[in-house]
A protein has these predicted regions:
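Loop-helix junctions at membrane interfaces
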Residues: 1-140
Length: 140
């Protein structure tokens, strides 16, 4: 990883966090929120591959939760969004079909990850309640 990549990843993390904090929609049923962080994660993964997706996904997911007052989700967001960025970045450069498969798999990882994180923190009803919001968050 070069200094140039570190600088670009840092800028993408900052942009993703700023965008997410600008559009932050609380979801009382899950004790969480919906943001636009996927835009930054998928953009970085598409442009810079799996390492960029992993770095921006993990760091921005963690920072968004800590800054917005949801620290209980921070470690889960670090892991889930990092894996989401890694997977989507892995498939991004191969072909258009592969890129779309990466987006679908990244969405699946995020939705299932937060289903289990919600279950761990608050029980199954919270985990299940997170599915529609997380699907919308990924589609937007």
């Amino acid at each position: 990883m070069t200094t140039k990549h570190i600088t670009i990843y840092a800028l993408m993390i900052a942009l993703t966090v700023a965008l997410s904090l600008t559009v932050l929609i609380p979801v009382p049923a899950t004790n969480g929120f919906v943001t636009l962080c996927e835009a930054g994660i998928y953009t970085t993964a598409s442009l810079f591959g799996p390492l960029g997706g992993l770095t921006v996904g993990a760091a921005s997911g963690l920072l968004i939760d800590l800054i917005s007052g949801y620290p209980q989700w921070a470690i889960f967001s670090f892991l889930i969004h990092g894996l989401q960025g890694l997977i989507s970045g892995y498939f991004a450069k191969k072909s258009t079909t592969s890129w779309l498969i990466g987006l679908v798999l990244g969405t699946f990882v995020m939705v299932i990850g937060y289903l289990f994180a919600g279950w761990f923190l608050y029980g199954w009803p919270s985990g299940i309640a997170s599915i529609p919001g997380n699907m919308i968050q990924n589609i937007v």
